[in-house]
Regions:
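Active-site neighborhoods and metal-handling regions in enzymes and metal-associated proteins
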Residues: 1-599
């Protein structure tokens, strides 16, 4: 079936239930960014494969909202579907709640699967549509009636992350969170987020591709903890370890029953941005809801000393693999056929040679030429193209190791470049280098740092329509909060001070539709720089250790400070990576990291 046929079947089910709109989000039951195959309902209906987007289906129309990363991709994938693309944040584009208010009649009904809609999103729709007395119908997953060959829920075995990697035991983490619960006056904490449950219990799984988490909820009280999980995924050994730490098991779907059974007067802590709407609706009226940002978010974001040191080890392994890949690509292109997909598979094979390699951390982006202008392009059998010994290849990839999670982008010159390609590459590199060299007082947020990366681009009348940086988990999601580097304060729902020990990305870019794209990305860890009479200064230490492409740099556009920072980074790369290379690869690394001279 194509999207037109699928939407027609969905509308039949909507009509049976007198629904005036049906909302399909990207999320699973845990508001996760990346989801398992079972939860890709929006992709199934629309054909749009991006990681962010919401579909609204009306009786006679449909619209899909996505952000700037996916404008070009979505416009291509939605062609012929009858679905209108709503470019979020652009002039004249309504937000979803306002759209629903304007298109659903008085006393009408909006349907959705309330397990996949966050409480905050449902609340925002309710507030906007209240004046028209519009009601919700959230008990049914109508997509399930249309998607006849839908994949089953994943149920992969859990595994334990040793304390040598995590740095804190399960008991220590539980005590920390219970301490925060006391401070916040909560007697029960409902934890629906997969990454938070995994972090708190030092457990990992394989229920979501690229993200080592498992389908679960945790109900935490001061004297006990209940893990709602698919029992067959938990070995007897892990169950015994959990029991010794005061954690008992319950069936995965029991979370709603357990919440509904909470006694009168219970003060229930939950994060409305991360808890689904059905959980909130299950809370008894006699209980009090404390809708607060989850305290685990900040705990998880500030990496332990052990996590930081392990991440350094992971990035050395990753740096070796990516450096070898760049050497291979530059020396093989034009001599034998290479496509985007074959290059992607080559890089994965090099990473897999590293000790403790687990999997990729997201779908690899290997984008040649004009494909590089599609911010989150992912090569498929249908879109794969051969690469030639000219132009640019944008490679945004990452990996999961026992020692940590990586995410790196390098834009690689495959041969001769145009003056425009070199100019754009160099401007992006300048912004990347300048953010990487930031020294700032504690108390700054990502909004304060963002302009360092964008200034060289703004001065040239250029910009990019995505964040400059996102937090990264430890053997968890490649994207995590609460830290974020972005200039647009209006889009920031929650502001976060940058703390020592946080790890986030530094990834400015420029994308010229139909031509090429450039993005350069390192992960950095926040460290203390100095403390003096003015306060506590922080700085950014690069974790990613892979050379930039000197073949793509226009040295005349670099300042003397840029040159100094470039040479210092390359010296660090050579010192860390060279012991693991030999022969021609080592000789190439020497050339790639040789100091450049200021013009």
């Amino acid at each position: 079936m194509n999207p037109v046929e699928k939407l027609a079947l969905l509308r039949v089910e909507m009509k049976k239930r007198h629904l005036d709109a049906y909302v399909v989000v990207t999320d699973d039951f845990h508001t996760s960014e990346y989801v398992g195959a079972h939860f890709k309902a929006r992709e199934f209906l629309s054909g749009f494969t991006g990681s962010a987007g919401t579909l609204v289906v009306l009786p006679d129309a449909a619209a899909l909202w996505t952000d700037g990363r996916y404008f070009l991709q979505a416009s291509q994938q939605l062609e012929g579907s009858g679905i209108e693309l709503m470019r979020m944040g652009q002039p004249g584009v309504p937000e979803i709640p306002a759209f629903l208010r304007d298109h659903v009649p008085e006393n009408g009904w909006i349907g959705f699967d309330s397990r996949t809609i966050s409480n905050d999103f449902a609340r925002s729709i309710g507030e906007k549509t209240r004046e028209k007395h519009i009601r919700f119908a959230g008990d049914e997953d109508l997509v399930d009636l249309v998607w006849t060959d839908r994949p089953a829920l994943s149920c992969e075995p859990l595994w334990e992350l040793d304390v040598q990697y995590a740095g804190l035991t399960r008991r220590e983490k539980l005590a920390m969170v219970r301490g925060k619960m006391k401070e916040m006056g909560a007697s029960v904490f409902v934890i629906p987020s997969l990454d938070e449950v995994a972090w708190l219990l030092n457990l990992r799984g394989n229920d979501v591709l690229f993200t080592p988490v498992f389908l679960s909820y945790l109900l935490l009280e001061q004297d006990k903890a209940t893990l709602c999980v698919q029992r067959e995924a938990v070995s007897a050994e892990i169950e015994a370890h959990l029991k010794s730490d005061g954690v008992t098991l319950a069936p995965y779907d029991d979370i709603y029953r357990l919440v509904a059974a909470l006694p009168t007067g219970t003060r229930v802590l939950l994060d409305g941005e991360r808890a689904n709407y059905r959980i909130l609706q299950s809370v008894p009226e006699s209980a009090e809801v404390l809708d607060r940002t989850s305290p685990i978010q900040l705990m998880k974001a500030v990496k332990t000393p052990a996590e930081q040191e392990n991440e350094r080890l992971a990035h050395i392994k990753d740096g070796v693999a990516v450096t070898r890949f760049i050497y291979w690509l530059k020396h093989t292109i034009g001599k034998e056929p290479i496509t985007e997909l074959s290059a992607s598979k080559k890089l994965e094979s090099l990473r897999a040679e590293g000790e403790h390699y687990l999997e990729q951390s997201f779908d690899p982006i290997l984008a040649y030429g004009a494909h590089g202008a599609i911010v989150h392009y992912e090569p498929t059998e249908e879109t794969d193209i051969p690469m030639e010994p000219r132009g640019l290849c944008l490679a945004d990839t990452g990996a999961q190791y026992l020692e940590g999670t990586t995410d790196i982008t390098r834009t690689i010159a495959l041969g001769p470049l145009t003056d425009e390609e070199k100019r754009i590459y160099t401007l992006v590199l300048r912004g990347h280098i300048q953010l990487g060299a930031a020294k700032f007082l504690h108390g700054c947020m990502g909004e304060n740092l963002d302009m360092l990366a964008r200034t060289p681009l703004w001065e040239a009348g250029l910009d990019f329509n995505h964040g400059t940086g996102h937090g990264v988990g430890f053997v968890l999601g490649v994207h995590e909060g609460p830290e974020r580097v972005h200039w647009d304060v209006k889009r920031q729902k929650r502001h976060c001070v940058i703390e020592e020990g946080m790890i986030f990305s530094n990834e400015p870019g420029i994308y010229l539709a139909g031509k090429f794209g450039v993005r350069i990305e390192n992960l950095v860890v926040v460290r203390e720089a100095e403390v003096n009479e003015y306060g506590r200064f922080l700085a950014l230490e690069p974790l990613t250790l892979v050379p930039y492409d000197r073949d793509a740099i226009d040295l005349s556009l670099l300042s003397s400070r840029d040159v100094e920072l470039l040479n210092a980074y390359h010296a660090k790369v050579f010192a860390a990576i060279s012991p693991y290379l030999s022969g021609d690869e080592l000789e190439w690394l020497k050339e790639a990291t040789e100091p450049v001279q200021f013009c």
